């Protein structure tokens, strides 16, 4: 592969390159459902819920970055400490040409893997996929300054949109960090791994970061911090939705509530209405009543038994290779290899 050639398959014809910047976009634009229809579809469900990606407007992304620095929120620093300690072992176990990060953001944690790739193989390709263009630009600029041996080709898309664009002729390590998998319900879990497995070649690997089942007090503190940043983050979604669809959620009449659901092994994050509100959607001429003390589920964060998860992913032809964890066994990095057909 030539130095300036993108790591995309024939489907790269559906992409366009932004002013020679090594960031690619879908030619026909990202496939987006009308946000009003998307929001109404889930709010008319019983129980009511929202799709978690609405959390990440500019303010939401800023709040989440602050949450990651909180003493109660152990996930980010624990995962990065594992990566820092084991990156060389991961790259040695997964000899690939290309690293594709799904939902990369600024790709800060992945730099440990890229540095190990340079140390062991002198060069390589990094292809982050993310819906955040500013995050991709930050990642590209960091890569240019600190990792010039790595060829950078970012893709501005949702990862499921980007799967089909990755060249199967390249040996690839797919990276999915941050326990983002924990935000998936059962249907999303199956859909994600079905699509990912189809996109992988027989010499490809997956590195998966997941939060583990642990003491309930530790879990609940991580999602109910003393500064109230998580509450602000969750309730901010309604300000975002108000701007998107011209609805009238009143943030002054709601509060945040979270708890650990033992049966489903997940933290559940809700907005609870403190007074009855008529929520209107003027562009559709419809409304619903959000009654006092009724809840809307905004996000879940599932926790995992790593051994059980390894067995589940065999169904998607992903075989376990290595398991890395921290001294407290709070978080796991799981390395899988795609089985040959």
Regions found by a protein language model. Name each.
Residues 220-306, 310-318:
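Substrate-binding/catalytic lobe of Class I Rossmann-like enzymes that use SAM or dcSAM, i.e.
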Residues 199-213:
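Conserved beta-strand signature within the Rossmann-like core of class I S-adenosyl-L-methionine
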Residues 106-121:
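Conserved SAM-binding loop of SAM-dependent methyltransferases across substrates and taxa
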Residues 47-94:
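Class I SAM-dependent methyltransferase Rossmann-like catalytic core
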Residues 190-202:
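A short glycine-rich, Lys/Arg-flanked "PGG" loop and its adjoining helix->strand segment in the class I
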Residues 2-54, 61:
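N-terminal auxiliary segments of SAM/dcSAM-dependent transferases
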Residues 129-133:
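Conserved SAM/SAH-binding beta-strand->alpha-helix loop
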Residues 96-105:
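Conserved class I S-adenosyl-L-methionine
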């Amino acid at each position: 592969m030539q130095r300036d050639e993108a790591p995309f398959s024939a489907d790269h014809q559906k992409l366009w390159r932004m002013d020679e910047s090594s960031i690619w976009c879908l030619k026909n634009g990202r496939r987006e459902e009308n946000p009003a229809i998307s929001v109404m579809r889930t709010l008319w469900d019983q129980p009511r819920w929202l799709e978690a990606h609405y959390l990440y407007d500019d303010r939401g992304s800023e709040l989440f970055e602050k949450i990651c620095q909180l003493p109660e929120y152990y996930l980010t620093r624990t995962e990065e400490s594992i990566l820092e300690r084991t990156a060389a072992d991961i790259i040695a176990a997964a000899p690939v040409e290309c690293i594709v990060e799904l939902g990369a953001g600024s790709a800060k944690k992945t730099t440990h893997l890229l540095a190990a790739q340079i140390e062991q193989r002198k060069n390589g390709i990094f292809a982050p996929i993310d819906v955040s263009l500013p995050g991709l630009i930050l990642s590209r600029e960091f890569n240019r300054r600190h990792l010039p041996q790595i060829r950078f080709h970012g893709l501005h898309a949702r990862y499921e949109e980007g799967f089909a664009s990755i060249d199967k002729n390249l040996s690839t390590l797919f990276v999915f960090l941050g326990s983002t998998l924990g935000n998936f319900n059962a249907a999303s879990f199956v859909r994600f791994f079905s699509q990912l497995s189809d996109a992988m070649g027989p010499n490809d690997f997956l590195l998966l970061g997941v939060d583990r089942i642990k003491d309930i007090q530790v879990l609940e503190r991580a999602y109910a911090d003393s500064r109230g940043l998580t509450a602000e983050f969750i309730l901010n979604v309604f300000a975002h939705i108000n701007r998107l669809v011209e609805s009238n959620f009143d943030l002054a009449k709601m509060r945040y509530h979270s708890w650990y659901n033992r049966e489903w092994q997940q933290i559940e994050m809700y907005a609870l209405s403190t007074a009855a509100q008529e929520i209107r959607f003027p562009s559709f001429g419809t409304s619903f009543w959000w009654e006092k003390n009724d809840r809307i589920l905004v996000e879940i964060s599932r926790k995992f038994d790593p051994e059980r998860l390894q067995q589940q992913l065999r169904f998607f032809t992903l075989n376990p290779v290595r398991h890395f964890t921290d001294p407290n066994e709070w978080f796991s990095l799981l390395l899988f290899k795609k089985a040959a057909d």
